[in-house]
């Protein structure tokens, strides 16, 4: 009877493990779903929680029985797993090493093609907005297309939107296509194409730098796999194109012929990237020191000189033509962010980018990148370390700011993986490790894995990752020292290539899971659906919307006589909300569902004569609710006290 209960328990555990694996695969393929079970909203998004439960169940299953067959079908043997991982790595190494050049280029085109399809899907299906920045880019181009007479925020340089986004929109507009949806999509397609160029540039740069096409292939693969590259490459935000300029500049610096001409040209290309996004000027630092460390000092100074001249010329001319004053946006940016310190974006700690590794990449590829430090990196590390250090000094930090760093980061990861595959194939590992993992280290490692999984979505877990990692290292050396002092050193053995193969396969699996998990670029689709609905209404009364940028600002609603933004920071104040919706000029109010329920504004809107209008049947994570004022004569004096 006891054996039957144990078998049943193991079978139930196995079934739960299979179900969780199915959930993870479902989320990776669909991006997850939001749905109702009765009246309860269920959010099945992100693989972190299912993977954490899967890891816990796996540990329990292992502790209960190592010999019982999984689902009663087959026993999972550690030696068999190691052997199969080793075989897989060896086949991968030989397969790529023996590829003919034309086949490698076919794979390159295949990867670029798949990446393009994913980005086009993102750009078309997720038609919302990521931040106010993307809205402002289109507002600058739309103001010319539709002759608004007003322009966007005056701290944004017109160089990027007017040179890269405006031309394709102007062509469509001249053909009679004036629907904002298609104009916005066309702007995003420009960035999608540049992201494809970035993939090819990484391939040729890595292949040339390390004289290895497999390294170039792996580097490009990891860039295509990058969630940051994929999501930002399917938006209208400028860093993807700025990244193209940085990669082109680096490629020019690698050329062995005509260096006196090409290096100054590289400086001008860097200036274009910095003019697209001012913060990219920091890449002048790694460019200078890269040349300096290669003893090309004269070329380094010529690069800086041409950068300064080109940057000044571009910003003088673009601001003069758009704003009517040279350096207008640059001066306003310095005044707003540095002198007056009026930026409301928030401030992050100095170590934010290290603690938020899971947001801009993943801990598995980060570990692989660290492995590359033992190889000859050709000084490429400076293109990763210097920008991260400099960006860490800025008060406001976001994962997307590291987008131009990602290509160089992926080159380091690609070099590391190809090197490890070669060493596994040749069994070329000279390091020695202790035969058995001690209990204290094992006790620390188990929660560390769970913490790493959760740290992929929550930077606060980053502190625990480094805390537990430090404790493991400290315990390892402390135990070693105690044993040596007692005259009983640890028994050590040469590391087995098959064990490294297992770790590499698991690391690559982790990279794929956590990067693909971030592929689907959901934005403010509900807000845009609401704006498109309002655009079709003949009611010309004003519109008040919470965080109006989520609805596209003026992009869809510029014909409305009044657009009022209800600031998120003030919506909790009842008096502010009432002042926003009060009066006959406002006929429509759009408010996020969580704000409506949190502050109880539904009854208040009904009291002012508003009734809810359905504009979409889709269930989304971030949902807007739309209210229309039916009674224009409603001027009741309401109790506005908090």
Residue map of PLM features:
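Membrane-lumen/periplasm interface segments of specific transmembrane helices
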Residues: 283-346, 350-367, 381, 391-394, ...
């Amino acid at each position: 009877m006891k054996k039957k209960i144990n078998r049943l328990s193991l079978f139930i555990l196995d079934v739960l493990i299979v179900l969780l694996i199915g959930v993870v695969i479902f989320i990776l393929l669909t991006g997850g779903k939001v749905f109702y079970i009765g009246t309860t909203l269920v959010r099945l998004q992100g693989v972190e929680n299912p993977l954490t439960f899967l890891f816990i169940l796996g540990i329990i299953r292992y502790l209960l029985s190592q010999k019982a067959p999984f689902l009663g079908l087959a026993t999972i043997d550690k030696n068999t797993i190691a052997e199969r991982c080793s075989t897989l790595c060896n086949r991968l190494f030989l397969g790529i090493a023996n590829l003919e050049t034309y086949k490698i280029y076919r794979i390159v085109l295949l990867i670029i093609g798949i990446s393009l399809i994913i980005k086009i899907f993102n750009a078309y299906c997720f038609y919302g907005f990521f931040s106010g920045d993307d809205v402002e880019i289109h507002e600058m181009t739309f103001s010319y297309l539709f002759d608004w007479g007003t322009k966007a925020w005056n701290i944004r340089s017109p160089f990027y939107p007017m040179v890269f986004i405006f031309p394709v929109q102007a062509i469509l507009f001249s053909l009679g296509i004036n629907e904002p949806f298609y104009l916005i999509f066309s702007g995003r397609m420009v960035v999608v194409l540049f992201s494809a160029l970035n993939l090819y540039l990484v391939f040729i740069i890595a292949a040339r730098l390390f004289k290895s096409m497999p390294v170039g292939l792996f580097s490009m693969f990891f860039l295509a796999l990058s969630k940051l590259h994929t999501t930002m490459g399917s938006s209208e935000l400028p860093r993807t194109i700025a990244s193209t300029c940085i990669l082109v500049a680096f490629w020019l610096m690698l050329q062995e012929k005509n260096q006196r001409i090409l290096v100054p040209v590289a400086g001008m290309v860097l200036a274009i990237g910095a003019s697209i996004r001012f913060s990219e000027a920091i890449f002048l630092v790694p460019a200078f020191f890269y040349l300096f460390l290669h003893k090309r000092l004269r070329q380094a100074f010529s690069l800086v000189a041409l950068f300064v001249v080109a940057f000044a010329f571009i910003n003088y001319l673009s601001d003069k033509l758009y704003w009517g004053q040279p350096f207008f946006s640059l001066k306003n940016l310095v005044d707003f962010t540095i002198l007056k310190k009026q930026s409301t974006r928030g401030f992050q700690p100095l170590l934010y980018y290290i603690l938020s590794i899971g947001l801009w990449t993943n801990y598995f590829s980060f570990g692989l990148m660290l492995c590359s430090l033992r190889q000859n990196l050709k000084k490429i590390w400076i293109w990763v370390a210097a920008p991260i250090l400099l960006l860490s000094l800025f008060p406001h930090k976001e994962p997307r700011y590291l987008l131009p760093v990602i290509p160089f980061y992926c080159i380091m990861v690609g070099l590391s993986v190809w090197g490890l595959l070669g060493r596994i194939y040749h069994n070329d590992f000279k390091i020695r490790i202790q035969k058995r993992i001690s209990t204290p280290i094992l006790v620390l490692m188990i929660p560390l894995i769970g913490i790493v999984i959760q740290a992929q979505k929550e930077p606060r877990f980053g502190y625990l990752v480094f805390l537990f990692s430090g404790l493991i290292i400290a315990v390892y050396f402390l135990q070693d020292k105690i044993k040596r002092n007692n005259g009983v050193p640890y028994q050590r053995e040469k590391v087995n290539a098959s064990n490294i193969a297992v770790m590499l396969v698991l690391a690559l699996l982790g990279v794929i899971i956590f990067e693909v998990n971030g592929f689907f670029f959901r934005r403010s689709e509900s807000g845009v659906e609401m704006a498109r609905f309002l655009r079709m209404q003949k009611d010309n009364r004003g519109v008040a919307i919470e965080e109006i940028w989520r609805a596209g600002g003026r992009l869809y609603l510029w014909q409305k006589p009044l657009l009022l933004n209800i600031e998120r920071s003030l919506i909790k104040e009842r008096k502010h909300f009432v002042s926003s919706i009060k009066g006959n000029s406002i006929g429509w109010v759009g408010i996020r569902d969580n704000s409506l329920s949190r502050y109880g504004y539904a009854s208040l809107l009904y009291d002012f004569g508003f009734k809810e209008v359905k504009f979409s049947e889709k269930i989304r994570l971030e949902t807007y609710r739309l209210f229309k004022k039916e009674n224009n004569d409603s001027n009741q004096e309401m109790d506005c006290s908090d």
